[in-house]
Amino acid sequence: MAQTTDNAAIAETLKALEITSENAGTSTGLQTSNSGKLITSVSPVDGKNIASVTQTTPEEYEQVVQTAAEAFKVWRVMPAPQRGEVVRQFNEELRRLKEPLGKLVSYEMGKSYQEGLGEVQEMIDI
């Protein structure tokens, strides 16, 4: 099992984002899977392990693609105001989690905190 960094600030950030030491790497939105081998994210800042995620198997990939194709059939007939509401809610979550996401981006990518916040802001602006 991978060790999560002992840095208190990063540990708090991971907790705020509900990231554990081992995380499922595959999700259909309703189901997650963690049957693949673990890949560990290592911070270039201090060389410490951040967390691990399971690799998606070919079978899991096919399931995700099939589920996405089925979801698209529902999404495309949903009225624009309802689709807009989904996008608005997603945007609200990004805004709510901007600081911890920015911290994680900076730690995981070796960027400054301001650059990490900027990356998240770009997602919000889209």
Sequence positions of predicted segments:
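Terminal low-complexity tails and localization/encapsulation signals of metabolic enzymes
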Residues: M1-S52, E85, Q89
